[in-house]
From Swiss-Prot:
Active site, UniProt feature: 151
UniProt binding sites for NAD(+): 12-13, 34, 79, 315
Alphabetized GO MF terms: glyceraldehyde-3-phosphate dehydrogenase (NAD+) (phosphorylating) activity; NAD binding; NADP binding
Enzymatic class: oxidoreductase
Name under which the protein is recorded: Glyceraldehyde-3-phosphate dehydrogenase
Source species: Ogataea parapolymorpha (strain ATCC 26012 / BCRC 20466 / JCM 22074 / NRRL Y-7560 / DL-1) (Yeast)
Length: 335
């Protein structure tokens, strides 16, 4: 059964979600809404991408439509989601990638406009969060508004799940070394809630807060209250890396941890969790569709119960792939 989809917000995630969705036979993207992007500009932004390269296909625009490989996708420019004619256009599922409507109250506007389900492509304070490969099978059809959590939670959760299932986690601290995102500044500018966040993105390492580690406790209740973390924003355009330092319940060796991660990556979490023992750097993971790639050569064990683990993720492309995976799962369960 084909899922009829609308995308609200045509930024980094919205455009990559569309690229990925177009490759799936059971997804039909009908419309896009972005108050700041007209159809001609949407075509340009979709066609050319400084990070992931030029779109391999034809991209044009005709009037109010974005035309990709001959397929017409209507472009709306409504500021208020309640005014987007999702119902009239036959859209059942909305992917909200604005970063603005992240609560149930905000996302409800899409339902009011005729959509049946909304997936928020950001963490949410009150909508249930799902991470593919970790807790997505707990989704039930009565849930109309849900969150795909954050890119960092999608990297950390599969890693933490495997470690906790095998050795048990007493407690842990996470640091994500995170690439620049659109909210940062090209030169020093005002940022009243986060003063450091207002400093030049391309010339600084910027400590920042993140709820990604605590959010793991929402998708893995066994780890609630056991993980927290922070972020270091660094001057790279894409690909980030999680550094997870944990106290384990069960003593082990680093070699055994690597074997456990490799087994999980080749088994139940294939395509979501990856494994590498090569001398890789961040750019080697550009446009990698996996949520998390465990780096066997980067971690270190101090004692049999105290270990630092490292896992890479394309915070744009890997995350966008999971958004589409979650959409497919929701559509299948809801059919």
């Amino acid at each position: 059964m084909t899922a009829n989809v609308g995308i609200n917000g045509f930024g980094r995630i919205g455009r990559l979600v569309l690229r990925i969705a177009l490759s799936r036979d059971d997804i039909n993207v009908i419309a896009i809404n972005d108050p700041f992007i007209a159809p001609d500009y949407a075509a340009y932004m979709f066609k050319y991408d400084s990070t992931h390269g030029k779109f391999k296909g034809t991209v044009t625009h005709e009037g109010k439509y974005l035309v990709i490989n001959g397929k017409k996708i209507e472009v709306f420019q409504e500021r208020d989601p309640a005014n987007i004619p999702w119902g009239k256009e036959g859209v059942d599922y909305v992917l909200d990638s604005t970063g603005v409507f992240t609560t149930i109250e905000g996302a409800q506007k899409h339902i009011d406009a005729g959509a049946k389900k909304v997936i928020i492509t950001a963490p949410s304070k009150d909508a249930p969060m799902f991470v593919v490969g970790v807790n997505h099978e707990e989704y039930t059809p009565d849930i109309k508004i849900l969150s795909n959590a954050s890119c960092t939670t999608n990297c950390l959760a599969p890693l933490a799940k495997v470690i906790n299932d095998t050795y048990g986690i007493e407690e842990g601290l996470m640091t994500t070394i995170h690439s620049i995102t659109a909210t940062q500044k090209t030169v020093d500018g005002p940022s009243h809630k986060d003063w450091r966040g207002g400093r030049t993105a391309s010339g600084n390492i910027i400590p920042s807060s993140t709820g990604a580690a605590k959010a793991v406790g929402k998708v893995l209740p066994a780890l609630a209250g056991k993980l927290t973390g922070m972020s270091m924003r660094v001057p790279t355009t894409d690909v980030s890396v999680v550094d997870l330092t944990v106290n384990l319940k069960k003593p082990t060796t680093y070699e055994d941890i690597c074997a456990t991660m490799k087994k999980a990556a080749e088994g139940p979490l294939a395509g979501i969790l990856g494994y590498t023992d090569e001398a890789v750097v961040s750019s080697d993971f550009l446009t990698d569709s996996r949520s998390s790639v465990f780096d066997a050569k980067a971690g270190i064990l101090l004692t049999p119960t105290f270990v630092k683990l490292v896992s890479w993720y394309d915070n744009e492309y890997g995350y966008s792939t999971r958004v589409v995976d979650l959409l497919q799962h929701v559509a299948k369960v809801s059919a």
